[in-house]
Amino acid sequence: MALILGTEYCKMDSNGRFKFPTAFKKQLASDESRFVIRQGFTAECLELWTFDSFQIEVQMLSKRLNEFDLEDRKIIRQMTRANIVELDSNDRLMVPPERKSVLGNAKEIVLQSTGKCIEIWERNAYDKMNDNVDDLAELVNKRLGGQHELPSAGDAE
């Protein structure tokens, strides 16, 4: 699974369809057309995962959590509450009806890469979220300051 990078602005039609950006498609393997959409956890957005990367994420989650523990089970259930979607013949994805409420009646959306997945934001909510990152340098220093070791090539996979 390729690491998808970038930010793309898209139009969404009344049926919840949007054209998957060419810039993102070029970063995928030629046969990748299945995706998973789920509710974002820390933001007013959706998360779009390639099908393969979502399977890996769920496998890693399963290794860390105990499916017999009620709290862990709740996390697993929430993390896997998702929909599988596929690119149509026009390279469009459709946001499932039960997920559209997160985006409201958006006509403009923003696809923002996080490295692992792509967040889907309603344009105004995205702009508002970005207005709140004035203290980004302070936040980066707080969370990453002093961590100067670079990962080895094997750690990046």
Give residue spans per PLM region.
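A short beta-strand-loop micro-motif that forms or neighbors metal/cofactor-
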Residues: A29-C45, A82, S101-M129
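Short, solvent-exposed interaction modules
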Residues: I56, S62-K100
